[in-house]
UniProtKB/Swiss-Prot annotation:
Lineage: Bacteria, Pseudomonadati, Pseudomonadota, Gammaproteobacteria, Lysobacterales
GO molecular function: rRNA binding; structural constituent of ribosome
Protein name: Small ribosomal subunit protein uS8
Oligomeric and partner information: Part of the 30S ribosomal subunit. Contacts proteins S5 and S12.
Pfam families tied to this protein: Ribosomal_S8
Designated gene of the protein: rpsH
GO cellular component terms, A-Z: ribonucleoprotein complex; ribosome
Keyword set, alphabetical order: Ribonucleoprotein, Ribosomal protein, RNA-binding, rRNA-binding
PANTHER family: 40S RIBOSOMAL PROTEIN S15A
Organism: Xanthomonas axonopodis pv. citri (strain 306)
Function: One of the primary rRNA binding proteins, it binds directly to 16S rRNA central domain where it helps coordinate assembly of the platform of the 30S subunit.
Alphabetized SUPFAM superfamilies for the sequence: Ribosomal protein S8
Gene3D superfamilies named among the record's database cross-references: 3.30.1370.30, 3.30.1490.10
Family, per entry: Belongs to the universal ribosomal protein uS8 family.
Biological processes per GO annotation: translation
Length: 132
């Protein structure tokens, strides 16, 4: 069965696992999911990520969630651009999440990066999601 929005699936799985206190999340892997998870790891929202081969020879992404004093580090995880309505922003129009306390993950011509990195690189792109 094909998935219409794999990025939304990734975000919902992370949000649901954090809500019930799970340590890890396993889901089918893709290049964009790994890139988004790598940004989350670089920004300190998750502990680790691993790509492994499942028994059916499909790549599987395992994300190790991060908690602080028993509460998940990720409080808000929201999809912005979606398959039915893509949201593109220029370098001067990139959003700031919670006045700079959160991040927006942007898909640019130079790869997937945070809003701050995109501003620094002077590029705009598709605003994938917000994390706080």
């Amino acid at each position: 069965m094909s998935m219409t929005d794999p990025i939304a699936d990734l975000l919902v799985r992370i949000k649901n696992a954090a809500a019930v206190g799970k340590q890890t999340v396993k889901l089918p892997s893709s290049k964009i999911k790994v890139a988004i998870a790598q940004v989350l790891k670089d920004e300190g929202y998750i502990t680790d990520l691993r790509v492994t081969q499942a028994e059916n020879n499909k790549a599987e992404l395992e994300i190790v969630l991060k908690y602080f004093e028993g509460r998940p580090v990720i409080e808000t995880l929201k999809r912005f651009s979606r398959s039915g309505l893509r949201q593109y922003r220029g370098k001067t129009e990139l959003p700031k999440v919670l006045g700079g306390l959160g991040i927006a993950i942007i898909s640019t011509s130079k790869g997937i990066m945070t809003d701050a990195q995109a501003r620094e690189a002077g590029v705009g792109g598709e605003v994938l999601c917000f994390v706080a």
